[in-house]
Amino acid sequence: MSMTRQEIQDLCVKSLEEKMVGTTDKGIANGNGFYQYFFTNFPDLRVYFKGAEKFTAEDVKKSERFDKQGQRILLACHLIANVFTNEEVFKAYVRETINRHRIYKMDPALWMAFFTVFTGYLESTGSLNDQQKAAWMALGKEFNAECQVHLKNSNLPYVH
């Protein structure tokens, strides 16, 4: 089933209703919870978090660093979901995200892989249905496509 940009945006935004950012305990827990899920289910990717390579979910839960990082990642997901219908703004945000992450020398395949991780987190908390997951993966495909173009144009490693 093919979806329009508006349908994708609406479904992604809806899936985030229970995962709001904010300074409340729940808002902070929403973001930190993503990293607890991430560190538990994708331990091989902890290498990208200097100083936290050996962290467990329990370490993440108690970490102010991941409280803050969780807010940043959730905010980023809210932003890309909410601007998806504005293709130029969406692409500009993708490029800016790449620029901010250059210093980490990430495997370029991880840009698409993120959406598998993120939808897995949403599923694990009961915040995602099949249609919303398909929408996130469609958004992720577009996100990744712009990532790879920008990486190539920046003379950085990219997925061919």
UniProtKB/Swiss-Prot annotation:
Keywords assigned by UniProt, alphabetized: Cytoplasm, Heme, Iron, Metal-binding, Oxygen transport, Transport
GO cellular component terms, A-Z: cytoplasm
Subcellular location: Cytoplasm
CDD domains reported for this sequence: Mb-like
Residue intervals of the Globin domain: 2-152
Pfam families xref list: Globin
Sequence positions that bind heme: H101
Major localization class: cytoplasm
Entry GO MF terms: heme binding; iron ion binding; oxygen binding; oxygen carrier activity
Listed InterPro entries: Globin, Globin-like_sf, Globin/Proto, Globin_nematode, Mb-like_M
Disulfide bonds: none
Function: May be a globin and may play a role in oxygen transport.
Family, per entry: Belongs to the globin family.
Name the UniProt record assigns to this protein: Globin-like protein
Species this chain originates from: Caenorhabditis briggsae
